[in-house]
């Protein structure tokens, strides 16, 4: 087996502070220009986002370097990972457990160093760093017939430690149950063990002139970013109930990201707000609210419905970070609000990933599935979807969720990602 630290004379190492800054400056050419100057891009990354609880406690920059010159500023490629707790429910186990995942982002090779295989070397070595087995894993569908025991993935009881930590000293890598990324280059990452999963979304147009959103119930609460922490706690309780639901499949390991303090949602909103203040005229109206909480008819917190969103001022869209509804009426109220917000602030569309179609009575036929796979926008469920069209994303610049699995499993068990929504994107 190839060494975890070396591959044909190259190593992947945690970046020094100087390497991290150079990597950020390099990325500004690809992801900052022409809207942001290099200084603005660095400010976004280092001052605005780099000081958030999401970045400070979870982020790691990696760089691919020659094995004999690990601190060089002329490194070959770079990427980032974020350490993310997850909740895991296994067949045959009564209790939900906690484990670790890593999200991968900012995979970048400078133009002058491309077409040399550096990205492939880096992603291979990154898998070696994250996986307890120190290897590139099989794809999800190829693992279904396998039995894995003693994987070395860190797993703790639900009540062990507080929600954000594992009492492991913050060990980074070599302890993951899974990792995931959002591919902008189709299924390129499948050769390194990341399988595209859950790449469908519902898309709506903003409300047009004369259209009004559904009336909100008494007690509906609009949420500012700092108020999302409480919603994160509510959402965690709902996700725990969803994982523990005995009516679900007994042949699937089910997991979701565990973020009860809403660090990811708040990070994404802070990122989008930077664009609002940087790109829009000072006199232009800026959004104040990024979530809506609808109380249940019984007043029970567990039965509430809610949506969290951000404004993408580059693509001019409202991205729904989290959408939870307990009825078709609540769905209509939440979607109407999001579409109204899009209209108010000049957005061109709204998107929500992996909406719970079954709860709305939407059942896809084989013909529907085939049409989606061929790139057809499915519009025949507009009544149930409140004017929305169902879309399957493919190709470049489409942020395709892709998952790699490292942990223990029994033969025949599938892996099911619960709540695979926009709110975990990075």
Question: Positions of the model-derived regions?
Answer:
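Active-site rim helix/loop that mediates acceptor-substrate recognition in acyltransferases
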Residues: 26-94, 243-298
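A conserved beta-turn-beta hairpin within the catalytic core of GNAT-like acetyltransferases
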Residues: 87-103, 311-320
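Active-site/acyl-donor-binding loops of N-acyltransferases
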Residues: 162-165, 172, 182, 186-217, ...
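Intrinsically disordered, low-complexity domain-flanking/linker segments in eukaryotic proteins
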Residues: 131-174, 285-302, 370-394
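Amide-forming acyltransferase catalytic core, primarily the GNAT-like/NAT-type
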Residues: 195-321
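GNAT/GCN5-related N-acetyltransferase fold signature
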Residues: 64, 81, 109, 309-311
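Conserved acetyl-CoA-binding loop-helix of GNAT-fold acetyltransferases
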Residues: 106-109, 114-141, 328-343
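Contiguous mid-protein beta-loop-alpha structural module that forms a pocket-lining wall or clamp
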Residues: 120-254
């Amino acid at each position: 087996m190839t060494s975890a630290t070396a591959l044909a004379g190259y190593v992947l190492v945690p970046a020094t502070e100087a390497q991290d800054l150079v990597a950020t400056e390099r990325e500004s050419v690809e992801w900052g220009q022409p809207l942001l100057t290099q200084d603005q891009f660095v400010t976004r990354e280092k001052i605005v986002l780099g000081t958030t609880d999401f970045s400070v406690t979870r982020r790691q920059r990696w760089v691919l370097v020659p094995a004999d010159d690990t601190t060089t500023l002329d490194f070959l490629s770079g990427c980032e990972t974020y350490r993310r707790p997850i909740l895991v429910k296994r067949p045959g186990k009564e209790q939900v457990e906690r484990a670790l995942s890593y999200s991968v982002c900012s995979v970048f090779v400078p133009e002058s160093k491309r077409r040399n295989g550096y990205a492939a070397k880096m992603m291979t070595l990154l898998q070696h760093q994250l996986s307890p087995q120190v290897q590139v894993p099989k794809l999800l569908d190829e693992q279904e017939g396998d039995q894995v025991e003693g994987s070395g993935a860190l797993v703790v009881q639900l009540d062990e430690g507080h929600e954000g930590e594992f009492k492991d000293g913050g060990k980074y890598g070599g302890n993951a149950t899974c990792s995931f990324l959002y591919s902008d280059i189709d299924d390129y990452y499948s050769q390194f063990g990341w399988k595209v999963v859950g790449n469908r979304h519902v898309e709506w147009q903003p409300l047009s002139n004369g259209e009004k959103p559904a009336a909100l119930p008494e007690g509906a609460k609009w949420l500012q970013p700092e108020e999302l922490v409480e919603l994160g706690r509510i959402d965690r309780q709902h996700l725990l109930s969803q994982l523990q639901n005995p009516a679900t499949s007994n042949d699937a390991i089910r997991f979701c990201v565990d973020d009860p303090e809403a660090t990811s949602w708040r990070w994404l909103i802070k990122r989008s707000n930077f664009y609002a203040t940087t790109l829009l005229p000072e006199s232009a109206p800026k959004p104040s609210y990024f979530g809506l909480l609808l109380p249940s008819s019984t007043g029970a917190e567990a039965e509430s419905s809610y949506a969290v969103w951000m404004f993408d001022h580059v693509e001019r869209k409202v991205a729904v970070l989290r959408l939870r509804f307990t009825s078709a009426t609540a769905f209509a109220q939440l979607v109407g609000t999001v579409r109204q917000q899009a209209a108010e602030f000049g957005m061109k569309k709204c998107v929500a990933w992996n909406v719970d179609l079954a709860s709305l009575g939407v059942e896809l036929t084989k013909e529907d599935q085939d049409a989606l796979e061929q790139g057809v926008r499915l519009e025949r469920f507009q009544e149930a979807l409140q004017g929305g069209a169902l879309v399957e994303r493919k190709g470049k610049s489409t942020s395709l969720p892709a998952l790699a699995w490292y942990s223990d499993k029994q033969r025949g068990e599938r892996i099911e990602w619960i709540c695979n929504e926009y709110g975990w994107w990075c």
